[in-house]
Amino acid sequence: MPEPYPVDPLGYLTDTQAWDRDFADSRAAADGLSLSAEHWQILDLLRGHYAEFGSAPPMRLLTRLVTQRLGAELGNSRALYRLFPEGPAKMACKYAGLPKPVSCI
């Protein structure tokens, strides 16, 4: 059965317009995660940033954006790694249907 979403070999969508919440849920489940309300806040923030600037933010910028828009409780590396243990910028962008950030942890 063919992949229902156009992805590259690393699992990132090759067409950001093909993203939907089911894509995020299925990718997270494949990584052993269940997306919480906090995850969705980050994913929505990333998609908004991408829509406005045409790029996925690297880790430092992601942390700053989360702090500014969602508060310091989520806007720190420890909280972001708790949500996205394999690397917040990398995992969150994958689930959000965005390209892998150029410089991500």
Provide a role label for each language-model segment.
Residues 33, 40-45:
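Acidic, aromatic-enriched beta-alpha/helix-loop junctions
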Residues 43-50, 67:
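Amphipathic alpha-helical segments that form the core helices of the histone-fold
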Residues 12, 55, 98:
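Gly/Ser/Thr-rich helix-start
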Residues 7, 61, 67-105:
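Helix-rich interaction surfaces within compact, conserved domain-sized segments
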Residues 1-35:
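N-terminal first-folded block
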Residues 15-23, 40-41, 55-58, 69-72:
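Short acidic alpha-helix initiation/capping motifs at coil-to-helix transition points
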Residues 34, 52-58, 80:
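Short acidic, glycine/proline-enriched loop segments that cap or flank alpha-helices
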